[in-house]
C-alpha cells in the first residue's frame, strides 16, 4: 500500500466556517499564527500542539486549525481526539478534513466509515487517489466485487502497476487463473516489483518450475534497482525452493 500523505499545511480551504468572537487582538492573532508557523518549520511537535490548542480555544470555528489539531492527534495515533476534531472541522466547512477522517477510519480498520467519507470527499474533490483507498477498504473487507471495480478505476491512471497486481491477487484467490495471469503481466509491464514474486508463485503452483524460475530470476534483477530487501529475500527463497524441487 502506498503511504498516505496527510495534508498538514498550505491547505486551501473551500469553507472556513463562521468565526466566533475572540478577545485576542488582530496583532496577537497574527503573532500566534507566526509562532505556529515557526513551530512547524522547526518540527517542534510539543510546542505546536500547545499553540494550536491555544488558537482553537480563541477561534473554535476556524476549520483550518481544527483540521490541523486533528492531524497532530492522528500523527500521535490519538485517534479518539483526532476523530473529534476532524468532525468539528468538517462541521465548519473544511473539506480536507473529510479525506483525513476517511484515512483515520482506515487506520482504525473501520472500513465502512472510511469508504463513506472517501466517497463523500470524492463528490467534492475529484481526486483519483481516493479510488485507491476505497478499493483498499473493500479489499480489507473481503468484498472483492467492489474492490475490483475500484482497482479497475485506479488502473486507468496509475503508473506503477500496484492496482493491476492487486487485481491479479484477487482473481487468483477466486481461482480465475486466466484473469490473474492477465493482470500480473499488466502489473509487470508497468514495472511493479511484487508482481514478479506473484508470477513466480503462480507458475510454481501450476507445476511449471521453469517459468517460475524465470520470473524469480527476473524479479531478483529488478530488486537490484530498488531498496526492497524483503522482496529480494522472498524471491531468493522461492528460487531456492524451485531449484531444490527439480
Predicted segments, located by residue:
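Canonical tetratricopeptide repeat
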Residues: 67-68, 100, 133, 166, ...
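N-terminal leader/linker segments that initiate helical-solenoid repeat arrays
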Residues: 16-64
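Register position in tetratricopeptide repeats
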Residues: 41-42, 75, 104-108, 140-141, ...
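Terminal, low-structured helical/coil segments at or just beyond the last alpha-helical repeat
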Residues: 205, 211-246
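Short helix-capping/linker turns of helical repeat alpha-solenoids
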Residues: 61, 93-94, 125-126, 158-159, ...
Amino acid at each position: 500500500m502506498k503511504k498516505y500523505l496527510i495534508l498538514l499545511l498550505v491547505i486551501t480551504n473551500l469553507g472556513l466556517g463562521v468565526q466566533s468572537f475572540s478577545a485576542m487582538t488582530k496583532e496577537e492573532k497574527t503573532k500566534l499564527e507566526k509562532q505556529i508557523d515557526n513551530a512547524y518549520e522547526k518540527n517542534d511537535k510539543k510546542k505546536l500542539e500547545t499553540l494550536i490548542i491555544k488558537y482553537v480555544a480563541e477561534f473554535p470555528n476556524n476549520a483550518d486549525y481544527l483540521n490541523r489539531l486533528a492531524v497532530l492527534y492522528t500523527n500521535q495515533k490519538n485517534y479518539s481526539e483526532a476523530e473529534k476534531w476532524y468532525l468539528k472541522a468538517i462541521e465548519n466547512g473544511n473539506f480536507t478534513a473529510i479525506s483525513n477522517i476517511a484515512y483515520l477510519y482506515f487506520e482504525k480498520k473501520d472500513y465502512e466509515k472510511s469508504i463513506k467519507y472517501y466517497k463523500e470527499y470524492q463528490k467534492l474533490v475529484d481526486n483519483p487517489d481516493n479510488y485507491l483507498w476505497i478499493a483498499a477498504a473493500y479489499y480489507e473487507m473481503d468484498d472483492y466485487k467492489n474492490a475490483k471495480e475500484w482497482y479497475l478505476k485506479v488502473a486507468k491512471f496509475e503508473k506503477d502497476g500496484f492496482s493491476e497486481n492487486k487485481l491479479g491477487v484477487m482473481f487468483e484467490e477466486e481461482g480465475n487463473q486466466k484473469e490473474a495471469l492477465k493482470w500480473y503481466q499488466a502489473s509487470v509491464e508497468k514495472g511493479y516489483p511484487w508482481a514478479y514474486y506473484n508470477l513466480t508463485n503462480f507458475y510454481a503452483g501450476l507445476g511449471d518450475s521453469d517459468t517460475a524460475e524465470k520470473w524469480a530470476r527476473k524479479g531478483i534483477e529488478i530488486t537490484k534497482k530498488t531498496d526492497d530487501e524483503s522482496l529480494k529475500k522472498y524471491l531468493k527463497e522461492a528460487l531456492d525452493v524451485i531449484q531444490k524441487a527439480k
